[in-house]
Amino acid sequence: MLYRRNPQLNKNGELIHLLSIEGLPKAILTQILDTAANFVSVNNREVKKVPLLRGKSVFNLFFENSTRTRTTFEIAATRLSADVINLDIARSSASKGESLLDTIANLSAMAADLFVVRHGESGAPYLIAQHVAPHVHVINAGDGRHAHPTQGLLDMYTIRHYKKDFSNLTVAIVGDVLHSRVARSDIHALTTLGCPEVRVVGPKTLVPADMAQMGVRVCNTLEEGIKGADVIIMLRLQNERMSGALLPSSQEFFKSFGLTNEKLQLAKPDAIVMHPGPINRGVEIDSAVVDGTQSVILPQVTFGIAVRMAVMGIVAGNEA
């Protein structure tokens, strides 16, 4: 019954695909975070490898541009001793009109074991998961505006690392929430892990109308949104996904919602500042904050390797 309700889980409730944080039980999120904690030390070894995925083939399919996500997935799979194949979409048959499912079918014929997929269309990883063989696993590396589950998980790992638990935290998510798959994944993860107050902060034009239904507090001024916050997650303006005049200008946005050291004083003294990247300095966040003592943006990237190792190791170890 669990498998029918959630295509990410097998009949025993074990994770076989990671498509979205939404709908996953707290126990699975905790399992991933705990497993990631064990992998963090691998990054500090002289030989940065474990044999967990030896003999497995991992295909990275990035239909959208990426630096951090693609690179950390490649590093994670390599450190698990997998064979990693990065498909060059621009030079593949997909650029000649081959359908997504035909691409997957052909790669599956090459004995793929795991697909890491980033796609501009929401739901694309779900479609792939429905059409792969039972022994093949799918990880969503970002689909449209829908979800970015491994970013959400590495954000949770970062928060837990610095704040220990979620039970008394106030977390503010600031910026272009409307177009952000990261915001949605973070919100689902935070609520599942028991964070008592999640605030969504941004101009009305960049906050979805139904956001309050997700159990968050909507704030339309930065000052209200970050006052007393323990964690501030800044989001970039996704101009490539915008249509119409949602903002007067990036300069006006920075004036109202850009995080500066002066505004950061409104948060708790030990607040941490996060950002999923890429960062637009001087648009959503000032360079002094990015490079300041409360920024944990680079540790997020480091933790992302361990989290993605954990996800790949867990899904590859479970059968449909």
UniProtKB/Swiss-Prot annotation:
GO cellular component assignments: cytosol
NCBIfam families: asp_carb_tr (TIGR00670), PRK00856.1 (NF002032)
Disulfide bonds: none
Assembly and interaction partners: Heterododecamer (2C3:3R2) of six catalytic PyrB chains organized as two trimers (C3), and six regulatory PyrI chains organized as three dimers (R2).
Molecular function GO labels: amino acid binding; aspartate carbamoyltransferase activity
InterPro entries xrefs: Asp/Orn_carbamoyltranf_P-bd, Asp/Orn_carbamoylTrfase, Asp/Orn_carbamoylTrfase_sf, Asp_carbamoyltransf, Asp_carbamoyltransf_Asp/Orn-bd
Origin superkingdom: Bacteria
GO biological process: 'de novo' pyrimidine nucleobase biosynthetic process; 'de novo' UMP biosynthetic process; amino acid metabolic process
Reactions that this protein is recorded to catalyse: carbamoyl phosphate + L-aspartate = N-carbamoyl-L-aspartate + phosphate + H(+)
Record-listed carbamoyl phosphate binding positions: 68-69, 118, 148, 151, 277-278
A Pfam cross-reference name: OTCace_N
SUPFAM superfamilies per the UniProt record, alphabetical: Aspartate/ornithine carbamoyltransferase
EC number: 2.1.3.2
HAMAP family (UniProt xref): Asp_carb_tr
Name of this protein: Aspartate carbamoyltransferase catalytic subunit
Record has Transferase as a keyword: yes
Binding site for L-aspartate: 96, 181, 236
